[in-house]
Amino acid sequence: MSSLARTHHKPAVMPPELLDREAPGSDPAHHSEAAHLAAQAIVRRGRSGVAPDILDRLIKLADSDGLIELAELWSTSPAVSLPGTLWRLYVLRRAVMNDADRWSALFRAGKSVDDVTVVVAGVADPPGPAEMVEVTTAILTGAYTGDFAVALERAAAFCRVIAAGQAAHADSAEAHAAHHARSLTESSRRLAATASDLLSSADMWRRNHLE
């Protein structure tokens, strides 16, 4: 995931590659401290056996205009950090919710990436729009109620399949829509990088180094 244009103030337009955002300017040290403290507090709250209604509110933090607040707090955090990782999980779910049909088409196109990755992603078959929302919600839920590293590995696998789907669509579009094909290829590259970042975060979490 690399920096994209500032579109987080328009949450209805959410392509699969929208997983990095540039937050408004502020004191970098203060902003970083606030981002990390907020991420730590949210993770502690979610993993402390909270009531179902509180867990539901945590899962839906990025719903509606909440994405803007999260972007201002977390979007400039390093990819392999607790706030940067949470940002990616929330944006992944929000992006899917806003265009589940597109994501399901990309997932179907990318299922050939490899059997293990598809299994780890854990998407029900056939992978329709409802299944896309279900899996990204389950990933966030698992981050709070299960093994955090496993949730990140599942998110990484999901991103890898989508990236493969984007690459497949790019190949199909090359002959008649070269510009669109290049855009898909770049999106695929960014999402594959996101998957790698999530795996690195999972490893850091297991070693108690994800902060």
Q: Whereabouts are the PLM-identified features?
A:
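N-terminal domain-start signal
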Residues: M1-R94
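Acidic-enriched, low-complexity/disordered segments with a strong bias for Aspartate over Glutamate
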Residues: D20, D27, D53-D56, D63-D65, ...
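Short, charged, intrinsically disordered terminal tails
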Residues: S3-R6, L198-E211
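Arginine residue identity/basic-tract feature
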Residues: R6, R21, R44-R47, R57, ...
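Generic structural signal for hydrophobic core residues of well-folded globular domains
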Residues: I42, G46, L61-D65, W74-P78, ...
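Histidine (H) residue identity feature
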Residues: H8-H9, H30-H31, H36, H169, ...
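Long, charge-patterned amphipathic interaction tracts in eukaryotic proteins
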Residues: V50, I68, S75-E134
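Helix-driven interaction modules
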Residues: L106-A202
